Amino acid sequence: MILIDGKSLSKDLKERLATQVQEYKHHTAITPKLVAIIVGNDPASKTYVASKEKACAQVGIDSQVITLPEHTTESELLELIDQLNNDSSVHAILVQLPLPAHINKNNVIYSIKPEKDVDGFHPTNVGRLQLRDKKCLESCTPKGIMTMLREYGIKTEGAYVVVVGASNVVGKPVSQLLLNAKATVTTCHRFTTDLKSHTTKADILIVAVGKPNFITADMVKEGAVVIDVGINHVDGKIVGDVDFAAVKDKVAAITPVPGGVGPMTITELLYNTFQCAQELNR
């Protein structure tokens, strides 16, 4: 069994990116810059953004965090985004979710200039993904999954892939990326009947449902590759959507939780920020 070590791979990729960023800065005198916006005092949001700030510093990308009070109105937030859209020194914009209930998430996402939409959530980037447009900013977690498969030499062309979970953030975009990579893809969701009949046929199984230990050994094909996107808190520990202990001896390769997909998400955010800077300054 191969352990797909996202933490180690992420470290290697950041070192590669740091070299690229340094060369880019030397040749253009432009420093890529990411601005992250937090609305309110959600502790998890602050932790996530702090880790993104730290990662930016490691590769030579500038970052700025703007923290707004909980009572910030939607129009005030949209006005700030408009200012950042028109600031040529800012290349990438991230609004940390969740937002307070009185702010419409879609209005906020749609207001970010597609070329600065580092999360890849804007409808323009979603459409570009479908069309295989090279200017597409791909959503960070799905992009990280594809990078893991590629870096570990796991072939997608001709593979039968089952994605469990159909969210806009992971399930749908990773399904599209896999289609683009010439895989045959089945996307399962909560209305899928007889889920096991699908998962046991998968050469590659990707799980993103937010249910601890949801995938058990009897749901996985012998010799499959399993990518566990889940992050669940159980009895003070972080566990995935896959019962790792039961599944690991049955599969060819598997991601751990923590230390699998999670670190790759932040690394791809850095790569997207660099892509934003390059595209905006062509």
Swiss-Prot record:
Q: Which GO biological-process labels does this protein carry? A: L-histidine biosynthetic process; methionine biosynthetic process; purine nucleotide biosynthetic process; tetrahydrofolate interconversion
Q: Which domain of life is it from?
A: Bacteria
> What InterPro entries is this protein classified in?
Aminoacid_DH-like_N_sf (IPR046346), NAD(P)-bd_dom_sf (IPR036291), THF_DH/CycHdrlase (IPR000672), THF_DH/CycHdrlase_cat_dom (IPR020630), THF_DH/CycHdrlase_CS (IPR020867), THF_DH/CycHdrlase_NAD-bd_dom (IPR020631)
Task: Provide the binding site for NADP(+).
Answer: 165-167, 231
Q: Which Pfam families match?
A: THF_DHG_CYH, THF_DHG_CYH_C
Keyword NADP in record: yes
* EC annotation from Swiss-Prot or TrEMBL: 1.5.1.5, 3.5.4.9
Record field: catalytic activity: (6R)-5,10-methylene-5,6,7,8-tetrahydrofolate + NADP(+) = (6R)-5,10-methenyltetrahydrofolate + NADPH; (6R)-5,10-methenyltetrahydrofolate + H2O = (6R)-10-formyltetrahydrofolate + H(+)
The UniProt entry, under PANTHER family, shows: C-1-TETRAHYDROFOLATE SYNTHASE, CYTOPLASMIC, C-1-TETRAHYDROFOLATE SYNTHASE, CYTOPLASMIC-RELATED
- What assembly does the database describe for this protein? Homodimer.
| Task of the protein | Catalyzes the oxidation of 5,10-methylenetetrahydrofolate to 5,10-methenyltetrahydrofolate and then the hydrolysis of 5,10-methenyltetrahydrofolate to 10-formyltetrahydrofolate.
Record-linked HAMAP family: THF_DHG_CYH (MF_01576)
Name this protein carries in UniProt? Bifunctional protein FolD
The UniProt gene name for this protein comes to: folD
